[in-house]
Amino acid sequence: MLVNYDKESQAIAYGITGGIPEYLSKIDTNKSLDENILDLFFDENGTFFEEATNLLKQEMRNPASYNSILGAIASGASRLNEIANKVGLDTSACSSLLKSLIELNIVEKIYPVTEKESSRKTIYEIKDTMFLLWYKFVRPNYSNIQMGLGHIIYGQYVKPKISDYMGYVFEKMCTEYIYQEQVFLTLPFIPEKIGKWWGNDPLKKEEAEIDIVAINSDSCLLCECKWRNKELDSRVLTVLNSRKDIFKYKNKSLMAFSNSGFTEDAIEYAKNNDIRLVSFEMM
């Protein structure tokens, strides 16, 4: 469908449309990806300029509250009390609205993969990547886009941050790759759970976060995902390798993903420390 685009542009197109075939079909591959994003999202006559709010209006009686919650999450609030404070609701009411967004597959409730579902470490993220783009970049600039300033907004404020946005999308792509490898039985073990992990590193006495962790009763796989415009170097792998000591599993494996490849020192470090490297071309 996007054969005129390179793999990186295809991934961004996947992110901004949520991978929905109907939305992907709106992308004109005779235009650059930047032109498509401008035309679709940052023009008041664009196909997706009001798509997110229109979808909410179809599903919800009070879309304003849901809009506020999604805006809060897109701006960085992730815990229930943070979201509730940002939108001016009590936590009970906010929790009820979040539940509705989860049922619509717009938001997801996440807890560290090693914790129980009832964990108090629960956070909320926007699951639908098209909604994430809209609430992160379009909604805050809605009035300026209506004034015809979409090209300036995109060029000065959005395009420089697309890489950060794609970091989240890339994590989802890498997670899908792990599930695929699970089906093909090419992982070191068969995971019972796959997800994110965050918590305390007791050795370094600091908070730590790992993009993807797959576990079963006696094994774990720790994965780092990097979307950026330079090769992943050995420093990233050194940190990932040190995170192994946080976990008490008998068998521990490491994997690193990079959209821009790996430096020579990273490749050498990976060989010496049994870390599997996955380039964008391999996915």
Residue positions per predicted region:
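Short, cationic-aromatic polyanion-contact patches
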Residues: 37-41, 58-63, 79, 109-138
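Amphipathic alpha-helical "lid/sensor" segments that cap RecA-like P-loop NTPase cores
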Residues: 2-55
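A cross-kingdom feature that marks ATP-driven nucleic-acid transaction machinery
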Residues: 122-283
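Winged-helix-like regulatory helical subdomains adjacent to P-loop NTPase cores
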Residues: 33-85
